[in-house]
Design a protein with these regions (language model features):
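Short glycine-centered helix-capping/turn motifs at secondary-structure transition points
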Residues: 19-25, 47, 94, 135
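N-terminal low-complexity, Ser/Thr- and acidic-residue-enriched intrinsically disordered segments
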Residues: 1-42
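Low-complexity, intrinsically disordered regions enriched in charged/polar residues
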Residues: 9, 34, 42, 46, ...
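Charged, often glycine-rich, active-site loop that binds/positions anionic groups
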Residues: 33-57
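A general "terminal functional-core" signal
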Residues: 4, 51-327
């Protein structure tokens, strides 16, 4: 996508400038590498990989109504996925405690054989598969707080129990998946948890979901690594959304995940950038996440209050999830 598309290069450029101007020396950079085609093929079909590879050097190829390639899309998508894998290695090898991959294009909408919603390769799904196949982990938790449901990630692991997918997302909204009843299939039944929320939810609403649903589920699942599809389009003022999460809210969500990780997987948390199209909101949200990742001890989390509206919306989630988990 080009400079006038909401998913533009300026998204990562503004983050790079923020790191250079406000956080120089605070964090250890991890150099990206291109993911191999074999790594991409864990999630995506070979024919689709070859098709996307054939777009290299071409000015523009439209893949759906809002997703098109540029001359370097294939190369950049490989670097986004491979950069996330390098971040996972850096954590597991003890070089860093946790990480956030500030990459584009995003990935959680990408299906096995289809680009969707600005996404080409599913970075977080490839990361989870890498942890299982290459690093020998048995339980990986994916938390997706993006505005939109991660249809591609859900479908990648829908029949599996070694990867638990947990999503909060606004409804009704693109892509139309992510109902509470979509809980997995076969051995994966109960390992796909969707929490759809209507517009207007803010810091306390999301923190309540994390504290009252995600945390007890994670305590029972006992993940060995937590991956996060970090969408900053839930931030107040995002042009594609209607959520009201502020800078502090992104920090509290991060603290909540770090608290879960301390109990089950010695702090292993890796975030990968998904959405977020209001540049000031994106920059401020990422800055707060980085600040929380850098703390040795975040301290106790607040006990959030929840509105009657949110409580009613969550009732189907509690009923459905109790078939598989103690809540």
């Amino acid at each position: 996508m080009g400079p006038f598309h909401v998913e533009s290069p300026e998204r990562v450029l503004v983050l790079n400038r923020m790191l250079e101007e406000e956080a120089a020396g605070e964090f250890l950079p991890v150099e990206p590498r291109p993911a191999t085609e074999a790594e991409i093929a864990w999630i995506h079909e070979r024919g689709y990989i070859d098709f996307l590879k054939a777009t290299a050097g071409r000015t523009s190829v439209f893949l759906d109504g809002d997703t098109s390639t540029g001359p370097r899309t294939y190369e950049t998508a490989l670097l986004a996925a491979g950069g996330f894998l390098n971040a996972l290695d850096a954590i597991l090898d003890g070089r860093v405690r946790n990480a956030i991959a500030l990459v584009r294009p995003p990935g959680h909408h990408a299906e096995a054989s289809q680009a969707m919603g600005f996404c080409f390769f599913n970075n977080v799904a490839i990361g989870a598969e890498y942890l299982v196949r290459r690093r020998g982990l048995r339980r990986v938790l994916i938390v997706d707080w993006d505005l939109h449901h991660g249809n591609g990630t859900q479908h990648a692991f829908y029949s599996r129990r070694d990867v638990l997918y947990f999503s909060t997302h606004q409804v009704p909204l693109y892509p139309g998946t992510g109902a509470t009843r979509e809980t997995g299939d076969g051995p994966g039944k109960g390992y796909n948890l969707n929490v759809p929320l209507t517009a207007g939810k803010g810091d306390e609403d999301l923190l309540y979901v994390f504290r009252k649903i995600l945390s007890p589920v994670a305590a029972q699942f006992k993940p060995e690594f937590i991956l996060v599809s970090a969408g900053f389009d839930i931030g107040r003022g995002d042009p594609l959304g209607g959520m009201l999460v502020d800078r502090e809210g992104f920090g509290l969500l991060t603290d909540s995940l770090l608290a879960i990780a301390r109990l089950s997987c010695p702090g292993r948390v890796a975030l990968v950038l998904e959405g977020g199209y209001d540049l000031p909101t994106l920059k401020n949200g990422v800055r707060e996440v980085l600040a929380r990742l850098g703390r040795e001890d975040p301290g106790p989390l607040p006990d959030p209050a929840v509105s009657a509206v949110t409580a009613r919306e969550l009732e189907p989630c509690f009923r459905t999830f109790r078939d598989s988990w103690e809540l």
